[in-house]
């Protein structure tokens, strides 16, 4: 009998931000394959005796290859196991979800996707600001600041990213933001555009700082911490 895979979004780190459905799947799973940022308190909800397998990827450290992760997921499911693939934030955002779904489809293994709180939503909630504003911030855009090499992705839509009326959230962008900021300014975005750096979102060491895109670029050029972070810039990226 073939098993089943639940892609479970773990949220940004605070276990109280898990959905009820996420907790239910963890409590019934035979195996949990978890990302680096999905470990810790979230895993306390896993069923006692379940296999807990770390498959996370972090910039600057050795990580499992994606093909290995997909193969492991298929192998567990083919034993008939109920498998949770635990992904940080919302698993549909920058989580390489499609590649793992493709592997399951090729093996005729069923799956479901359980949404969760993305770190962008958790960050603005912690900062006490909204993502949108009537008339002046009508659009939200998410972009990754790193490709598979760790550099800034090619082919970015700079006209969209330099829109002064949008709220832009940059995931995994600390290492490349100095370059991105210069590109934004070259495309007409004011260096005084408000920006927010949110590190360790919804964890005990959470830190939120306010900048402009120019001052944030300078700040990050001086050195960065190893904590996961996101960057938000636009008209709402300032302390109310």
Q: What annotation goes with each model-predicted range?
A:
Residues 102-123, 134-141:
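Short, acidic/small-residue loops that bind anionic groups at enzyme active sites
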Residues 2-5, 78-83, 96, 139, ...:
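A contiguous loop/helix-start segment that scaffolds small-molecule binding in enzyme catalytic cores
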Residues 1-15, 20-114, 217-218:
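Class I S-adenosyl-L-methionine
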Residues 61-67, 122-124, 152-153, 205-208:
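Short, charged, surface-exposed secondary-structure boundary motifs
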Residues 51-65, 136-146, 168-169:
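Acidic/glycine-enriched edge-of-secondary-structure segments
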Residues 54, 85, 113, 133, ...:
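Structural signal for conserved beta-strand scaffold positions within catalytic alpha/beta enzyme cores
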Residues 16-18, 92-97, 117-125, 151-153, ...:
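Short glycine/serine/threonine-rich phosphate/pyrophosphate-binding segments
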Residues 105-108, 131, 186-192:
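A short alpha->loop->secondary-structure connector
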């Amino acid at each position: 009998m073939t098993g089943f895979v639940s892609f479970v979004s773990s949220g940004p780190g605070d276990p109280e931000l898990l959905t009820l459905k996420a907790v239910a799947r963890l409590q019934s799973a035979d195996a949990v394959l978890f990302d680096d940022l999905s470990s810790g308190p979230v895993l306390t909800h896993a069923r006692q005796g379940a296999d807990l397998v770390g498959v996370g990827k972090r910039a600057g450290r050795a990580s499992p290859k994606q093909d290995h992760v997909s193969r492991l997921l298929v192998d567990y499911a083919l034993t008939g196991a109920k498998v949770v693939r635990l992904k940080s934030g919302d698993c549909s955002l920058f989580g390489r979800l499609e590649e793992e779904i493709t592997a399951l489809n090729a093996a005729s293994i069923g799956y479901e996707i359980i949404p969760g709180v993305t770190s962008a939503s958790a960050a603005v909630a912690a900062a006490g600001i909204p993502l949108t504003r009537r008339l002046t911030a009508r659009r939200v855009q998410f972009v990754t600041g790193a490709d598979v090499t760790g550099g800034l992705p090619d082919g970015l839509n700079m006209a969209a990213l330099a829109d002064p009326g949008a709220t832009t959230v940059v995931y995994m962008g600390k290492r490349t933001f100095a370059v991105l900021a210069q590109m934004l300014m070259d495309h007409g975005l004011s260096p005084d555009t408000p920006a927010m750096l949110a590190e360790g979102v919804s964890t005990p060491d959470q830190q939120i700082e306010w900048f402009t895109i120019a001052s944030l670029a300078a700040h990050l050029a001086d050195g960065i911490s190893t904590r996961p972070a996101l960057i938000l810039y636009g008209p709402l990226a300032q302390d109310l």
